[in-house]
Curated annotation (Swiss-Prot):
It is an enzyme of class 2 (transferase). Keywords: Cytoplasm, Methyltransferase, rRNA processing, S-adenosyl-L-methionine, Transferase. It comes from Variovorax paradoxus (strain S110). The active site is at 173 (proton acceptor). This is Ribosomal RNA large subunit methyltransferase E. The keyword Lipid biosynthesis does not apply. One of its GO terms (molecular function) is rRNA (uridine-2'-O-)-methyltransferase activity. InterPro entries: RNA_methyltr_RlmE, RNA_MeTrfase_FtsJ_dom, rRNA-MeTfrase_E, SAM-dependent_MTases_sf. S-adenosyl-L-methionine binds at residues 64, 66, 92, 108, 133. Its EC number is 2.1.1.166. Gene3D superfamilies: Vaccinia Virus protein VP39 (3.40.50.150). Its main location: cytoplasm.
Length: 222
């Protein structure tokens, strides 16, 4: 079988699984932009991370499913268009369709220009929660992919160290495989409590998992 034929077969199988995915159907029915909303929902329902009145930063927010979930949880009635009680800042290098009540800033948060905008919205405040669904474009080369995943985790932790309350939490996506244990150690070096979490909404075939770090350790003690 040619490479082109194999690729076509894989794409057809993925499309079949996607169409029949119960979380895809649920997301469509409930108005979420992606099934990823249910991953954060499961983590939140298990650990009670999201509360009305919080300041939350969503890293790698596009297409916006996590911001949508945060928006609904932080509305008194849980409604998509209800009055927002809190602040949600969404960041991504890609564009994102607006979500009422969510402040979206497009760009790289490592760059001074965007960071100034973030600081302007924070207005001297620290975040209660930072969530990161950031993921690199995977190449299939394990060593290269592991390095890319590690880099994004390091960026999320660094952002949390600078902008998260001491008692706050960070939720970040990573993948089982090369470098996973080192990233768990990195989380433990930065947070007092670390919990791994594999939501039911993550596809069975996926190595995707999440780490939740709670209680930020001071930088000088690292």
């Amino acid at each position: 079988m040619s490479t082109k034929a194999k690729s076509k077969k894989v794409n057809k199988a993925w499309l079949h699984d996607h169409i029949n995915d119960p979380y895809v159907k649920l997301a469509t029915r409930e108005g979420y932009r992606a099934r990823a909303a249910y991953k954060l929902k499961e983590i939140d329902e298990s650990l009670g991370l999201v509360k009305p009145g919080q300041l939350v930063v969503d890293l790698g927010s596009t297409p916006g499913a996590w911001s949508q979930y945060l928006r609904r949880r932080m509305s008194p009635e849980g409604a998509a268009a209800g009055e927002l009680n809190g602040t949600i800042i969404a960041l991504d290098i890609l564009p994102m369709e607006p979500i009422e009540g969510v402040t979206f800033l497009q760009g790289d948060f490592r760059e001074a220009e965007l960071l100034e905008q973030v600081l302007g919205v924070l207005a001297g405040r620290k975040a209660d929660l930072v969530v990161s669904d950031m993921a690199p474009n995977l190449s299939g080369i394990h060593s290269a992919d592991a390095a890319r995943v590690a880099h994004l985790i390091e960026l999320a932790i660094d952002f949390a160290q600078h902008h998260l309350k001491p008692e706050g939490a960070l939720v970040a996506k990573l993948f089982h495989g090369s470098g996973y244990d080192e990233l768990v150690k990195l989380f433990k070096a930065n947070f007092r409590t670390v919990k791994p979490f594999k939501p039911k909404a993550s596809r069975d075939k996926s190595s995707e998992t999440f780490l939740v770090g709670m209680g930020l350790k001071a930088q000088e003690t690292l």
